[in-house]
Amino acid sequence: MTFSGFKVYYLHVLNIINFDSSDNHFALLVSLQDLLWPYPWKNWESVEMCRYDAALIPLKCKAQLDFIRHGGQVIGWGATHHDQWGFDPNLLDSTLTIPQEDKYLDCAQQYLEHQIKRARKMKVKIFRAWSYTGSNWYKDFYHRNGFEISLLEYISEISLDKFFIEDFESSVSRFKKSTYVISNLQELKKLNADWETKLFDLYERVEQDVPIDLVLDLDFDFWKSSIFCPWFKEEDVYIVVDGDKWVALSTYARSLRSNDKISTGLTGVLPEYRRQGICSAVKINALLDLKKKGFKKVFTGNEENNPMFQINLMLGFKKIGEEFGCK
């Protein structure tokens, strides 16, 4: 309501529903993601995908997800957990997803205080929040509560119908003159009995080079289960080989709900192989192959200070959104 030019919102008692892992709750979560997540994540997750990922979270991460109810209707959800990719009992991550309308600010405030209370009870030293919507609405909300942005990620996308190898002849020609070979995991695993270890070692070294606000501590079994999910395709992992050594990769993740769109997983090169155009070459090869497979769009996320963002722009990706982390 309004009074004398000021907006007044009634205070609502926080009403939350604990997630119970039932089919109904997974379906509700996916429907809320479709409603509240921005493109390209909208209509990306399926119940099967959510259920699989949830089952992987170790008990030590103490994951908690709640639905937030307002006026008798579920309007969003929030969650807290220790990061499974770099477990630290002193650091608790969180998300809060509700409609970006001022009438829900009171709900958001009460739920954030609920999350912070839980963090204090767990005696963590750092409380972080991640927003899939890098809007000023969310940034202002967290800023008012004393958070500082610690990571800004740019989301970009390319339409493959506008991607042609002729535009990158110099890069392709230069790479062909080298001794490096681009293959995919489907082919390389036939030639390498220790392919899982090789891929993990490459993945771990490349991941350590990504400018994030987290100290990674990859567990092999967790990594394996996360990467090799039921909808994973070995043909979507492109690897650059130098003799017997795996030196660079570009991985892609499919959705069970989208046949024409695919997400980039991880692209990078070992530090000692930098500045040779290897990342550009493997990415060009991957995009051309994905185009042949029938995909129409590829999207990705890069930290603002990640060199891969500039490489992607050079290849024709266009920035379409932002995500951010704060603490």
Task: Identify the meaning behind each predicted range.
Residues 2-53, 171-217:
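Short amphipathic alpha-helix that is part of the acyltransferase structural core
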Residues 213-239, 243-249:
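A mid-sequence, solvent-exposed acidic-amphipathic segment
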Residues 12, 18-26, 30-134, 241-242, ...:
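Conserved donor-binding loop and adjoining core beta-sheet/short helix segment
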Residues 145-165, 236-238, 264-265, 288-327:
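Active-site/acyl-donor-binding loops of N-acyltransferases
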Residues 2-12, 84, 99-191, 323-327:
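Acyl-donor-binding surface of acyltransferase catalytic domains
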Residues 104-117, 269, 275-288, 310-314:
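Conserved acetyl-CoA-binding loop-helix of GNAT-fold acetyltransferases
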Residues 240, 249-250, 273, 278, ...:
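Extended, compositionally biased non-globular segments
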Residues 24, 136-137, 306-307:
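Short alpha-helical
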